[in-house]
Regions:
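Short, well-structured N-terminal submotif of metal-dependent ribonuclease cores
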Residues: 1-33, 43-56, 135, 143-147
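Generic structural signal for small/hydrophobic residues in well-ordered secondary structure
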Residues: 3-4, 41, 75, 101, ...
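Alpha-helix capping/helix-boundary segments
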Residues: 6-7, 37, 71, 96-97, ...
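Short active-site oxyanion
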Residues: 27-31, 61-63, 102-107
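Acidic catalytic patch
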Residues: 63-84
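Donor nucleotide-sugar recognition loop
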Residues: 86-93
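Acidic, PIN/NYN-like endoribonuclease modules and their adjacent C-terminal/linker elements
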Residues: 98, 102-147
Length: 147
């Protein structure tokens, strides 16, 4: 499951994000995006046709997962427990992305680990390609293989 920020960094040519996306594609790893990620990416008001095409090209290497009732209810559960158990306000888009990752048993690739780290106790696996860039390859593959 790829978070919005990784795609934004990929489009900007940021090395760690570009590397992570290339690794996912080259190693034929199943890639998922939530429809909320698609909405966030296309909601920038000044996107050119070329930028829209690049976004679509990145999204086309994976599968877009719709927000259905299961995802919505899991997201609601995550938001409630985030507030109740951790006194954290989990934004709805983040809750949807996390819920989708959990329901798919997928690793969430994000730079915003801080927003999600409390959900590790509830089974969410996170990978930040910006951490320890020098040994990314080994850590990335082992993290994905654990699931």
């Amino acid at each position: 499951m790829v978070d919005t920020n990784i795609i934004i960094y990929t489009l900007a040519g940021v090395k760690a994000a570009v590397w992570a996306m290339k690794k996912l594609e080259d190693d034929d790893i199943e890639v998922y995006y939530s429809t909320i990620v698609e909405a966030e990416l296309f909601s920038f008001h000044e996107l050119t046709l070329e930028q829209k095409s690049k976004i679509r090209g990145i999204l086309d290497i994976g599968e877009i997962v719709d927000v259905d009732s299961k995802v919505a209810l899991k997201a609601a559960e995550l938001r409630a427990l985030s507030k109740k158990d951790y006194n954290r306000k989990l934004k709805l888009p983040d809750a949807i992305v996390a819920a989708t990752a959990l329901l798919l048993s997928a690793v969430l690739v994000t730079r915003n680990v801080e927003d999600f780290k409390h959900l590790r106790r509830h089974g969410l696996h996170l990978y930040n390609p910006f951490e320890h860039e020098e040994d990314n390859s080994q850590r990335f593959v082992s993290e994905l293989e654990q699931n």
